[in-house]
Amino acid sequence: MQQLIHRIWYQGHQAKWLLLPLSGIFWFISYIRRLLFSFGFKQAQVLPVPVIVVGNITAGGSGKTPTVIYLIELLRQHGYKPGVISRGYGVNVDGVVAVTPNAKASDVGDEPAMIVARTQVPMVVGAKRVSAAQTLLTDFDVDVIISDDGLQHYALGRDIEIALVDGERRYGNHCLLPAGPLREGLWRLNSVDFVINNGGPAQNGEVLMALEPAPLCLVDNNLQDKFNQQNSVVAMAGIGNPQRFFNSISQLGYKVVKTVEFADHQAFDQKQLSDLSVQHSLLMTEKDAVKCRDFAQSNWWYLPVNAKLNSEFDHALLSQLQQVAQTKKGLSHGI
């Protein structure tokens, strides 16, 4: 099914015509919902601290999680105390849940587990992002909130919007779900503050982002170790764009004898992964690693990646954030 969807969205498969009526329904529902917020029939919850939303207008992976981690580190370097909220895709969260560094991906979602394991940032997940944000403000000392995804979650007021675009796949066939990958039309990009292009080449004022690989880490203990690149590996990925990962490790010189794709956010079966690593080491993404750390074997590895953006983006974001923070601080003091 996943391969068929990819062919429809990105390779011109004619089955898209069968799905276009459903895309029309999707457009109508999305349009009415947005109108309700635009004309005040529904109110977005405005928070007392700046809110940065990191999302995209397409379904599937585009580099949001590395971008969120980059923002956490950038804000900390400039004296901010960021916190993060997320929906926790792939899991059923009862109410809101604070994510701890040892949280299981099966309880809070793979991206939240990865983000907190990497950064120890205060983070709350929940189906209702407004409730998650309010809990974050109540229970933690934060002065800026980053929403991991949620560009289309208009109930949450936001001050800065960052949209990610996959620089290789772009917008596919330019159709709305389910005939294409779009959650909203391309017009939506005109209203965001920054469009970040993951993998380039950048177009129309987009900010170019590169994902730089770090040394491999062992899945079972999360520690960097020296991997013998003469050893063959089975590469697996359960992410939005697994081919990007497979291409990356091949370009890095790893001897890939087999690639295995899983659905995004899919829970892994211990025996299934063990069978893949009987004769070869198993190499996966960091997001996949957090889902199988409890039963990982000694020849399972993951490839960490770090987002790299230019200083012009850093300056523009920090400048805009400072203005928002000053305005909200003034309002809280009745100025």
From Swiss-Prot:
Cellular component GO terms, alphabetical: plasma membrane
Pfam families: LpxK (PF02606)
Annotated metabolic or biological route of this protein: Glycolipid biosynthesis; lipid IV(A) biosynthesis; lipid IV(A) from (3R)-3-hydroxytetradecanoyl-[acyl-carrier-protein] and UDP-N-acetyl-alpha-D-glucosamine: step 6/6
Transmembrane segment boundaries: none
Catalyses which reaction(s): a lipid A disaccharide + ATP = a lipid IVA + ADP + H(+)
GO process annotations (BP): lipid A biosynthetic process; lipopolysaccharide core region biosynthetic process
A molecular function (GO) term: tetraacyldisaccharide 4'-kinase activity
Protein residues bound to ATP: 58-65
Keywords: ATP-binding, Kinase, Lipid A biosynthesis, Lipid biosynthesis, Lipid metabolism, Nucleotide-binding, Transferase
EC number: 2.7.1.130
Stored InterPro entries: LpxK, P-loop_NTPase
Protein family according to the UniProt entry: Belongs to the LpxK family.
General function of this protein: Transfers the gamma-phosphate of ATP to the 4'-position of a tetraacyldisaccharide 1-phosphate intermediate (termed DS-1-P) to form tetraacyldisaccharide 1,4'-bis-phosphate (lipid IVA).
Protein name: Tetraacyldisaccharide 4'-kinase
Annotated organism of origin: Shewanella frigidimarina (strain NCIMB 400)
